[in-house]
Amino acid sequence: MAAPSLVDLEVLSVWRGLARGGLLEARRADLALADLQAIPIQRVDHTALLGRCWELRHNLTIYDAAYVALAEALQVTMLTGDQRLASAPGPTCPIEVSKANRHRPDVP
């Protein structure tokens, strides 16, 4: 499994919001951080992806474009929980929508 190196910052940003909203206890967040660091994800520097991210800017956020650009570069299927991302024009990699998305009621 591979992801742009920004994956960790995105996860922490979500957890910060949950913690500030009282939906994630500090102890659980600390344990989750250790779990995140232990996940065997190949974290790929996004610098080489910037050109493709910019090309995708009209249809995707730059953050989403980084994941798409990486999947394209690795010639693999991208896994997401975001149906809108999967339906957006521009990506050339296959995109599969996970059915395990519990936080987005708008995703089937």
Feature annotation, model-predicted:
Residues 12, 36, 54, 88-90, ...:
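Short secondary-structure boundary/hinge segments and terminal tails
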Residues 4, 68-108:
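Acidic, PIN/NYN-like endoribonuclease modules and their adjacent C-terminal/linker elements
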